């Protein structure tokens, strides 16, 4: 298995698809990386030479991926929460922040339903 940016790339997949195993690299960015390095994107990962892998490692190193990207995203959300802006408050409350309705739906963001309060008769 090839190892790029601390991630094992599946051997049996094409280079373009295999690179998407790295957090922060999708199909379009993987294709651009392959074009920039001159590595054919439809070549299987197991068929790549050491020189090809080294070129890919260098090109992926120029992009923010994996832990750095996760940390950056977390810090952006934390900054919004510290500012106390609308989006930050919605993050803090665990509600959708892009204007979706919450009277019904929004179950993914709000979590499972809580038991309702029973009224006395």
UniProtKB/Swiss-Prot annotation:
Belongs to the universal ribosomal protein uS13 family. GO terms for molecular function: rRNA binding; structural constituent of ribosome; tRNA binding. GO terms for biological process: translation. InterPro entries: Rbsml_uS13_C (IPR027437), Ribosomal_uS13 (IPR001892), Ribosomal_uS13-like_H2TH (IPR010979), Ribosomal_uS13_bac-type (IPR019980), Ribosomal_uS13_CS (IPR018269). Keywords: Ribonucleoprotein, Ribosomal protein, RNA-binding, rRNA-binding, tRNA-binding. HAMAP family: Ribosomal_uS13. Pfam families: Ribosomal_S13. The keyword ATP-binding does not apply. This is Small ribosomal subunit protein uS13. Part of the 30S ribosomal subunit. Forms a loose heterodimer with protein S19. Forms two bridges to the 50S subunit in the 70S ribosome. Located at the top of the head of the 30S subunit, it contacts several helices of the 16S rRNA. In the 70S ribosome it contacts the 23S rRNA (bridge B1a) and protein L5 of the 50S subunit (bridge B1b), connecting the 2 subunits; these bridges are implicated in subunit movement. Contacts the tRNAs in the A and P-sites. SUPFAM superfamilies: S13-like H2TH domain. It comes from Cupriavidus metallidurans (strain ATCC 43123 / DSM 2839 / NBRC 102507 / CH34). One of its GO terms (cellular component) is small ribosomal subunit. Residues 91-121 are annotated as: Disordered.
């Amino acid at each position: 298995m090839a190892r790029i940016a601390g991630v094992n790339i599946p051997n049996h997949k094409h280079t373009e698809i295999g690179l998407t195993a790295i957090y922060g690299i999708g199909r379009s960015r993987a294709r651009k990386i392959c074009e920039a390095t001159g590595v054919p994107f439809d070549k299987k990962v197991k068929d790549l030479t050491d020189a090809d892998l080294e070129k890919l490692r260098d090109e992926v190193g120029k992009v923010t991926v994996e832990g750095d990207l996760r940390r950056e995203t977390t810090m952006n959300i934390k900054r919004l929460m510290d500012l106390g802006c609308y989006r930050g408050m919605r993050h803090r409350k665990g509600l959708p922040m892009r204007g979706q309705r919450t009277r019904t739906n929004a179950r993914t963001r709000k979590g499972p339903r809580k038991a309702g309060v029973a009224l006395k008769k």
